[in-house]
Amino acid sequence: MALTVPGKPYTIAVKPAADIMEESEIFDWVQLNIGEYGRDYEISYDDEIELTVYYFPTEQQALLFALRWAQ
């Protein structure tokens, strides 16, 4: 699943947690704190689509992010 948010310079994608933890991947990690919905996610810039991509381990986490930040 991937969501491109209209008017925002990013897209949101779901990536299995096991894939996020690959040591061969180098990404910046940040902590998202939205009240009780604090989640870990991964950020990468995709040159092909020229957007920042936020990777989440579950669809639910991605949707929570989309609902909060697509406003």
Q: What residues fall within each predicted segment?
A:
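Short glycine-/aliphatic-rich beta-strand segments at the starts of folded cytosolic domains
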Residues: 1-18
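Acidic, low-complexity, intrinsically disordered interaction modules
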Residues: 21-51
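Short, conserved charged micro-motifs
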Residues: 20-23, 62-64
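Short, compact, well-ordered microdomains
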Residues: 45-71
